Every structure is written in structure tokens, then in C-alpha cells.
């Protein structure tokens, strides 16, 4: 990011490693994520999230973008200013079920983005909201609908969007569907390849539908 000019992007929406050693909770020899129900049978490529980004990353992110939304912002409070804009993704988990799924996830938003907001969308193991069923191959994957909700609320047509940790590519698909300019980065070659394949399938299907 150091090569980018100030405010090169209108909005950065990022999901960096939280430093909670997610991969340490999985079966190291085949990447099977531990947990209850169907999620325990899902195979993921193992990645290392034990090292979260430091203060330099967040300083640069805020320099190159006019506004930011940072998933896991509750883990990075020491690096971020106070804000009223907390986005809560309510996964609508059942209260009477014992599982290892979080009921919600938090994202820090730049103070100028307004008050706290809640997005409700089922995302619990193999149970998903919406009319489609998204393929899942990344342990911290988020639904396309979540990113569409964010972009519809906080971005405008013509805005430039940045995602520094592309992961499964859900943000890219959402930006593509909404006609937003988008730049995404992914260091892990396995996830980069899977994301590219996922995006190619999605864009081809969308073009066939339009044609």
C-alpha cells in the first residue's frame, strides 16, 4: 500500500487475520475444520492467522482510503480510533442449539459512516440464508449478500473499493454485480486460485443470464 497515493480508494472493506490462531483449531494434516455438525466435515486449505497485522497496516489503510470497514475490529481496538459505526452481522443462530458458531460478527466502521447498523443473514454451517447456496472453501468466508448490503449502504456507483485480504472473493463478486470498481489482494496462492475459479464461474453465469 505504500506505493499508493493518499485516498486512492473511496472505501476499503477488509477482513484481516484476527490473530486468534483459527488454523490451530483444525486438523493439521488435512485441514478439516473442527466443530459441530456439517462444518466438521468441510475441508479447508490450512492458513496461518496467528499473526494479525500491526499498526502500520491500519495506518496505511486509513491513508489510502477515504473510509474503512474492518471485520474483526474488536480485535484491533488498540490500532483504531473510537467510532459509533459498528456493523453487526447477526447470523441468526438458534438459541437452543449447542454449536461452535458465533452468533454474530463485528466490523469497525469509520466514524463518518454513521451510527451502528445490523445486518441479519443466516450463516451457520451448511445452513445459509438467501435463495442460493454459496460454495464455501475458506474458513472465514462471508456471504456475498453481506458485502452487497455494505456496498449498497456505504458506496456509490463509480466508487473505488479496496479489499486487502480477498480470501474467498465474496467482496469481489458483490462489487462486480453492483458495477463498482474493485481492487483485491490475496497472498495465499491456493485461495487465490480458488477465488479466481469462483469468480470466473460467477461472471460466466451472469453473462449467460444477461445474454
Regions found by a protein language model. Name each.
Residues 2-14, 18, 22-48, 59-211:
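Class I S-adenosyl-L-methionine
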Residues 49-55:
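Alpha-helix-centered segments that form part of catalytic cores
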Amino acid at each position: 500500500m505504500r506505493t499508493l497515493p493518499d485516498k486512492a480508494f473511496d472505501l476499503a472493506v477488509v477482513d484481516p487475520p484476527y490473530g486468534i490462531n483459527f488454523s490451530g483449531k483444525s486438523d493439521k494434516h488435512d485441514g478439516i475444520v473442527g466443530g459441530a455438525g456439517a462444518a466438521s466435515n468441510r475441508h479447508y486449505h490450512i492458513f496461518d492467522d496467528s499473526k494479525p497485522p500491526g499498526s502500520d497496516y491500519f495506518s496505511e489503510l486509513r491513508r489510502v482510503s477515504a473510509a474503512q470497514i474492518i471485520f474483526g475490529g474488536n480485535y484491533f481496538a488498540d490500532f483504531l480510533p473510537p467510532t459509533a459505526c459498528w456493523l453487526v452481522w447477526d447470523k441468526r443462530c438458534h438459541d437452543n442449539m449447542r454449536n461452535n458458531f458465533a452468533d454474530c460478527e463485528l466490523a469497525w466502521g469509520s466514524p463518518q459512516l454513521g451510527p451502528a447498523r445490523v445486518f441479519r443473514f443466516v450463516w451457520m454451517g451448511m445452513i445459509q440464508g438467501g435463495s442460493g447456496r454459496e460454495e464455501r472453501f475458506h474458513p472465514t468466508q462471508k456471504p456475498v449478500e453481506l458485502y452487497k448490503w455494505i456496498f449498497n449502504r456505504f458506496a456509490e456507483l463509480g466508487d473505488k473499493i479496496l479489499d486487502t485480504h480477498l480470501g474467498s472473493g465474496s467482496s469481489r463478486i458483490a462489487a462486480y454485480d453492483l458495477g463498482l470498481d474493485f481492487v483485491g489482494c490475496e497472498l495465499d496462492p491456493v485461495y487465490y486460485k480458488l477465488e479466481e475459479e469462483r469468480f470466473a464461474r460467477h461472471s460466466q453465469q451472469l453473462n449467460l443470464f444477461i445474454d
